[in-house]
């Protein structure tokens, strides 16, 4: 069993994604998730750069900055999981042969805790992935307290915009860059011009998902 990761995910006009960029052990089944996230991250940036050639250098460079650290984290997690499941070493053998049977009676109680199950699902689905260290992730001033920060995955909430009630992820499904404005936020009309720039004014605070 082997795992590997490319030294870089981009060189000039060449980009690596999916198993061309990284290969993991099958433990926890992360390969497809990572490949889809690579494609989603890179796809819109290529489309935007094609529509707006000027100033796209930082945008395209951000792909390697964002996805390669995530690939390293996933590699470490899958390696640890495979080590625990299959290694013939003394410690993993002790964990499987002695500690796991002792802990097995606790499993039903743990599985009944919805927050624990939800946290496990989020982890395996790679939903907590964050790009806070990306050159594209710039915090506002003053920095907002609580909630997602620049580079975090945006939660899916129910909002009102342009007279309709809609889920936030559905509102943002259109390709391009999206600007979310509060009801009374100032926004010059001329800044809304340009291809792949979408401006949404939220007329109510996000409700619980």
Segments the model singles out, each with a brief description of its role:
Residues 48-209:
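Helical substrate-recognition/capping region of FAD-dependent monooxygenase/halogenase enzymes
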Residues 32-46, 50:
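Functional cores that coordinate and move charged inorganic groups
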Residues 1-30, 34, 55-57, 70, ...:
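FAD/FMN-dependent oxidoreductases across multiple families
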């Amino acid at each position: 069993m082997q795992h590997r990761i490319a030294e870089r995910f981009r060189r000039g006009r060449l980009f690596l994604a999916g198993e061309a960029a990284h290969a993991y052990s099958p433990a926890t089944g992360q390969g497809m998730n990572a490949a889809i996230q690579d494609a989603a991250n890179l796809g819109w940036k290529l489309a935007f750069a094609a529509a707006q050639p000027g100033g796209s250098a930082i945008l395209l460079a951000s792909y390697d900055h964002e996805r390669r650290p995530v690939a390293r984290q996933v590699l470490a997690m899958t390696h640890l999981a495979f080590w625990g499941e299959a290694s013939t070493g003394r410690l993993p053998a002790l964990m499987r042969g002695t500690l796991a049977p002792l802990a097995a009676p606790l499993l039903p109680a743990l599985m009944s805790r919805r927050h624990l199950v939800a946290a496990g699902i989020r982890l395996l689905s790679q939903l907590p992935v964050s790009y806070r260290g990306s050159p594209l992730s710039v915090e506002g001033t003053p920095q907002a307290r609580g909630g997602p920060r620049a580079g975090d995955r945006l939660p899916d909430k129910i909002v009102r915009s342009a007279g309709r009630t809609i889920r936030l992820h559905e509102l943002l499904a259109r390709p391009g860059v999206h600007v979310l404005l509060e009801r009374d936020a100032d926004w010059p009309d001329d800044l809304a011009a340009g291809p792949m720039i979408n401006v949404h004014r939220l007329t109510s605070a996000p409700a619980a998902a």
